[in-house]
Amino acid sequence: MSMKIKICIPTERIQNPIISETIVETGILLNIMVANIDSTYGELIADVKDSRFARIKKALESRGAIVAILDRPIHRDEEECVECGACISVCPMNVYSFDETWSLCVDEKKCIQCGMCIKMCPHGALKLGE
């Protein structure tokens, strides 16, 4: 099994090749799903095998990164949701779709907790981890 993790690289460490060094040192491959990195901060969402999490976390943290397990999927308030589809257009992982009756479907297992859908939802019907 694999798990999704969030890796945050603070400003003072952003110029260092933290991810590359960690992969070379540990031999553990990361499947990077989303990466937002600029000159001041870095944030990545990645998949790593459950059995290798502790080792990769230790190696990343020794380089100044902050690592967290993403285990709380998106929650949709069905009473607040008007099924407008705004979430479909911004989700990078295709968590949202319409079925054959045009009802909104949510595949929580695909969610990487990037928050794009939450920002886009005009009714505030989406939240993380509730």
Curated annotation (Swiss-Prot):
Pathway the protein contributes to: Amino-acid biosynthesis
Annotated residues for binding of [4Fe-4S] cluster 2: C91, C111, C114, C117
Binding site for [4Fe-4S] cluster 1: C81, C84, C87, C121
InterPro entries in the cross-refs: 4Fe4S_Fe-S-bd, 4Fe4S_Fe_S_CS, ACT-like_dom_sf, Fe-S_Ferredoxin, NIL_domain
Superkingdom of the source species: Archaea
Free-text cofactor note: Binds 2 [4Fe-4S] cluster.
GO biological process: methionine biosynthetic process
Residue ranges of domain 4Fe-4S ferredoxin-type in the record: 72-101, 102-130
Cofactor: [4Fe-4S] cluster
Molecular function as annotated in GO: 4 iron, 4 sulfur cluster binding; metal ion binding; oxidoreductase activity
Protein keywords: 4Fe-4S, Amino-acid biosynthesis, Electron transport, Iron, Iron-sulfur, Metal-binding, Methionine biosynthesis, Repeat, Transport
SMART domains in the record: NIL
PANTHER family xref list: ADENYLYLSULFATE REDUCTASE, BETA SUBUNIT (PTHR43687), L-ASPARTATE SEMIALDEHYDE SULFURTRANSFERASE IRON-SULFUR SUBUNIT (PTHR43687:SF6)
Subunit structure as annotated in this protein's UniProt entry: May form a complex with MA_1821.
Its job: Required for O-acetylhomoserine sulfhydrylase (OAHS)-independent homocysteine (Hcy) biosynthesis. Together with MA_1821, catalyzes the condensation of sulfide with aspartate semialdehyde to generate homocysteine. May be involved in the reduction of the disulfide formed in MA_1821.
Name listed for the protein in its UniProt record: L-aspartate semialdehyde sulfurtransferase iron-sulfur subunit
Phylogenetic placement of the source organism: Archaea, Methanobacteriati, Methanobacteriota, Stenosarchaea group, Methanomicrobia
